Amino acid sequence: MSEEVQSDVKRFLDRLDERVAERLAAQGTEPSWIAARRQAGAARFEALGFPHRRIEEWKYTDVRAIARGDFRLATDADFSPATAARLTLPVEAHRLTFVDGVFAPALSRLDDLPGGVQLVPLSRALEENHEAVGGPLGRLTGVEFSPFAALNTAFMEEGAVLRLAPGTVVEKPIILQFLSRAGEAPVMSHPRILLEMAGRSQATVIEHHVGEEQAANFTNLVEEIILDRGAILTHYKLQEAPLGDLHVASIHIEQARDSRYTSFNLNLGGGLVRNDLVAELNGQGAETHFNGLFYGQGRQHVDNHTLVNHNAPHTFSHENYKGILDDRAHGVFNGKVIVKRDSQKIEAEQSNANLLLSDRAEIDTKPELEIYADDVKCAHGATTGQLDEEAVFALRTRGIDAQTARGLLTLAFAGEVLEQVDLDAIAERVELAVAGKLPERFNLAGLVETAAALNEE
């Protein structure tokens, strides 16, 4: 490890020492298992350092903007209520809100939770019954997974815990909102999310990352999702962070028999974004659906790595990721499916399609299949291209000008993912965001109206 890298690592570990000292001075000792895991995370991070491009899984993503950053840790959750209202999704929901990683009770809504649902900030869950949290926390995403997972474990202090009792059906969505502030100095946060759904429970969770336009912070999230037999979860991750923000997320899902997990990974913001999404299909009848849409412009960098492990027979996975890249944006997609030995009668389908709106935009895509069973149905594919000029011409013959035609085709490309979204507020928000990012700067209302009229014909 070079002296420069050692210096970067030391700067983060110094921040950790400062934070631990502050916490101990304010609260006294912490449970021994928390201290042990924190130390393990710090030791692993110190040994690994930040990932570099000589590592295969990071060969297209440069994290020096994170490594060289001098990030502080937030100590309060002050945020303009008016700004928060403007940024919040217009969805009737239960909501936990965090500002730069600090729980914001004034911006949360927990007063009408139904029976069978526990939704609390991680800090409160640890205070009330830390032993109940200690078992599952870190079981799926340990310090060995990546340097960022180790760093998150070292700094672990806040996040969300969501537990559903057997047979519980939550009618309203649950929103986990993460707000990023524009301050005098950049800050970092390391939220930890633990979601446990007992048998036959059902919920929709919206994870929303958004913030003030001039914010330039670092979010390093770890999320562990455990679905018991027959549990059903729809998980929206809407990432609209400011372009100055840096965002890393590690999400692990463990699925028991007959459970179903549906993910919508929607990335519109952030200057540097890395998502790792891993599903473990451990019981027969388990289903995983990965849907993704990312839009990059300027010099945005968006990297999506997905992994589905078919660990049991009669399991099913479907993946559809689409990327739209403009200017000098860079996208990365690495989707991997592993079919374990004796996992017969599985079905796995994977697709990645990318649309380049600029000659300088770049995509690196790598779909992978590893199959160690012989009675399976598997398919994968990736395509990259520009808008179909024949389709543009066809729209122009209907009286639509060239710029609007290109905008409509781009929206249609995104729409193949968005039409699967059941929540209109999210689908419409993403659709308008995509239209607003298009290079021609269309009249948004007119463009959407034209698209709607064509759909009705």
Predicted regions and their residues:
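N-terminal amphipathic, basic helical "cap/leader" segment at the start of enzyme domains
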Residues: 2-150, 320
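Conserved beta-strand/loop scaffold segments within soluble protein domains that form the structured core
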Residues: 5, 118, 122, 128-400, ...
